[in-house]
Amino acid sequence: LSLDGFGCENMSAATCAAGALIYYLHETQKQEVQHIQSLRTYTTHSFVVLDADTLRNLELTQSMRDGSSKGSLLEMLDQTMTSMGARCLKQWLLQPHLKTDSINQRLEAVDELKSRISLQEELREALRQMYDIQRLISRISLGTANAREVLALKDSLRLIPSVKLQLEDCSAPFLIDLNQQLDPMTDLADLIDNAIHPEPPVT
């Protein structure tokens, strides 16, 4: 078995670490982790490496005064509508890009959204109604989700076409690419709709 197709050639230590992590998940979850179907390599060459002292001194996510998020850069910037957005913003702050093209694409996207107030408000309204899809998928994959959580996934998927529609006439490359990646998974949403009662019990 070779992982070279995933960009893991000459990365024996990383491959061993990934294997150990999968084994740990298998042992702790007491089942196959079938929802992990791909592997992506990560390199620090594309990002600024921030050590613990730098993170503390810049107060990116925690205040030096009491260690809480209050007063940190993250707390000031976080106007996200979803838990997924909050996690993404935190990751971007902790892993700043080094590539000029990537930085400029994000800036162009921010500029377009900032200049189009109606688009911004419509997107925020759709996202405000969305549940934490990443968390829901994880719970469903592990077999720990209840019926209401599966319905929450369906309700969130139903909002994606609206988001895609709002992004259709955007010109920023970052937003165009984002729109192309969004998949409403209509068949899955329909399947859930037909399989689960709209008002199931809690357990």
Give residue spans per PLM region.
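Short intracellular "coupling" helices and adjacent cytoplasmic loop segments at the cytosolic face
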Residues: 116-117
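Charged catalytic and DNA/RNA-contacting regions of genome-maintenance
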Residues: 1-112, 121, 125-141, 145-203
